[in-house]
């Protein structure tokens, strides 16, 4: 019901957090989203979740660098999880903990990932435009 309602309000993408659902729930939500012509981001936090996410072949996969239990952030989480999902045909996103262009460059050089979810760093930046320019340049 929520997926259909979201679509009716103009939603074009949903987020499935693997850690918050069991396998059957994730499957059902994914199928329902595709029926409503919605894009799906499947978020993973560890290698086990990444293995589960591979079956969602039309999804974007987001690798969250924040440990949900400790709230610690490690960019190396993207590096290690990427090894599990590097065969995924869709886009892969590195999420959380990217504070500088050098952080993004580190991930890009290790994995080739050039999609990043960056929020806090942009909000706290004295010059978000300059930060965005630097981030965009790393993949060009």
Whereabouts are the PLM-identified features?
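Short, surface-exposed connector motifs at secondary-structure boundaries
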Residues: 10-14, 32-37, 85-90, 111-114
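Active-site glycine- and acidic-residue-rich loops that bind
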Residues: 35-46
